[in-house]
Amino acid sequence: MIDITLPLTDIHRHLDGNIRAQTILDLGRQFNIALPAQTLETLIPHVQVTSTEPDLVSFLTKLDWGVKVLASLDACRRVAFENIEDAARNGLHYVELRFSPGYMAMAHQLPIAGVVEAVIDGVRDGCNTFGVEARLIGIMSRTFGEAACLQELDALLAHREKITALDLAGDELGFPGSLFLSHFNRARDAGWHITVHAGEAAGPESIWQAIRELGAERIGHGVKAVEDRALMDFLAQQRIGIESCLTSNIQTSTVASLADHPLKTFLEHGVLASLNTDDPAVQGVDIIHEYHVAAPAAGLSREQIRQAQINGLEIAFLSDDEKRALREKVAAA
């Protein structure tokens, strides 16, 4: 179902949600960190979703083992490099990797700005090695509160030229976007793009708030947008992208089944929705699965899947010249 004549993108992909089980095992042994299992086979159920989780917060606990083994900046650098290697193996031409430096630093009190630098270094080295194009999106983990998010923002701003956009992720219900207005004002002043996780656990009002008050140009997940016809019209007319993550939304119980997922409705309404993975290692999926298995199960036609692939580049945080160059590069391959 993937059109090989077009760039393949993944623009909603958490770097800290894509830490290989083998890497968790390796780093756990290297730093003498107690893990819930000592073999790859027995570790996987602890670090990967093997059935549907009851809610988003339960799903997020599966990510914790990955960051618990990040006991050094070199470990962060390794994980970043491996993210690009994984993207190359999946056939991705362009990826936007988002990461929460405070979350990655938390278990071992690493310097947050140092984590940002390590991720930048690892991604750069990976891109040079594997030929994938990548951009970095900094995440503020709302679950840890306004002050912690301010620390993350300061660390990201220390490397502002290497960061493309700012995101807000975590407990959407407990920590609404209205708490973070000043944070996003600073991000926009820095010239960054804005994307926000919204309409995943909360309703359409969360999406409206992200757009109107935080300046969101894209929305992560946004499944609840279908509950508000005026919002759907606004998204289409203003070309505000939706970063859809099919399998993830089932695993978090955000959507009951793939057949119920609103991606098809988004595309029919003219909303610029794209196909993405979210947390590939935790979910046990890759972008190929999303195109070949999840999208057809969600009722998308071949042409709609192709449109979602086109949308991925259309709403990417790249200049028109960069998009054109990527299209030409893929067409010539």
Swiss-Prot record:
Upper lineage: Bacteria, Pseudomonadati, Pseudomonadota, Gammaproteobacteria, Enterobacterales
Originating species: Salmonella schwarzengrund (strain CVM19633)
UniProt-listed CDD domains: ADA
PROSITE patterns registered for this protein in UniProt: A_DEAMINASE (PS00485)
Active site: 200
InterPro entries given in the database record: A/AMP_deam_AS, A_deaminase, A_deaminase_dom, Ado/ade_deaminase, Metal_Hydrolase
Binding site for substrate: 14, 16, 170, 279
Chemical reaction(s) catalysed: adenosine + H2O + H(+) = inosine + NH4(+); 2'-deoxyadenosine + H2O + H(+) = 2'-deoxyinosine + NH4(+)
Record-linked Pfam families: A_deaminase (PF00962)
Protein name as annotated: Adenosine deaminase
